[in-house]
Amino acid sequence: MAEIGIVGLGKMGANMAERLRKAGHDVTGFDRDEGSGRDVESLSELVHALPTPRVVWVMVPAGEPTYATVRELQGLLAEGDVVVDGGNSRYTDDQRHAEDLAGTGISFVDAGVSGGVWGLTEGYALMVGGTDGDVATVQPFFDALKPDGESGFVHAGPVGAGHFAKMVHNGIEYGLMQAYAEGWELLQAADVVTDVTAVFDSWRSGTVIRSWLLDLLVNAVKQDDDLSELRGYAEDSGEGRWTVQAAVDHAVPLPVITAALFARFGSRQQDSPAMKVIAALRNQFGGHAVTSSAGSQQVGADSPGADATAPAGTHDPASGRARGAAGTVPAEGAR
């Protein structure tokens, strides 16, 4: 079997190293954290422990941590070696890494990896970018990491294609999760369905919306029926933003994924400034009720089509006269 080095032994990296070892490969792991279970104490030691041509798989956070790791590897590796970035890097970063490494004869392959903490037992879906020759060099490791069967691996194209495919995959994931979440909220809000968890559980078999995400949702709500242990606060990994930005660059309409991303932004606001503006404007033009920051509500007409009392001194454009508090203005829906 082949030998490989893995840089980054977090949840994903450590599990991938274990899966590779179970498949019979020799793995040398390095992480800057002394408590990570690393095999060596430096990148230099990792490189010197591997036979040539070397394959080094990088599993560190995207951005500067990946850039710093690739830069250091560039000074340690030799012509014919291959660097694989299996993190969630942006595809444009891949292209830059490949260009930088090419000057010293080092190859670069990008691998979009999906599977999370379940990948150790179920396998990792792999979306790969690189030349045919470089992908072939790493193929034994791809075969060990991927799920059993014919699917779960794709050579998507040249360098950058793997992470571009993974980026779109994550964008789709945003949309799917948002759809399940909205359906859940509507079922909970109505008094028609008495067992929302059972409804979602029933959808896991035979329906057109069954999926692994649905399985995970049912698992979560069976542990916490109304999700009361959680706050409605959702971070984003960054790939949803990249997906939306790529859609703008290519003039591709992406309403569902964009809305799902923006919903996460909204979840992180304690008090929406935009909604404050809307509340203020509705009160100004229609006298609609508003709620103060202290929680008290001012009286005003807030039902569709209702007339509202105008603030004293409001100018009536039809009569040219200033109206007092007794005057009326059309409600929001009538304007």
Q: Model-found features: residue ranges?
A:
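Helical "substrate-binding/catalytic lid" subdomain
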Residues: 127, 137, 160-288
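Intrinsically disordered, low-complexity terminal tails and inter-domain linkers enriched
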Residues: 293-334
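NAD(P)+-binding Rossmann beta1-loop-alpha1 motif at the extreme N-terminus of oxidoreductases
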Residues: 1-54, 117-119, 283
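Conserved dinucleotide-binding and phosphotransfer motif residues
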Residues: 23, 104, 250
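Hydrophobic beta-strand scaffold residues
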Residues: 27, 108-109, 254
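Rossmann-like NAD(P)-binding element
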Residues: 32-34, 38-96, 120-130
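Rossmann-fold dinucleotide-binding core
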Residues: 4, 69-71, 90-181, 185-187
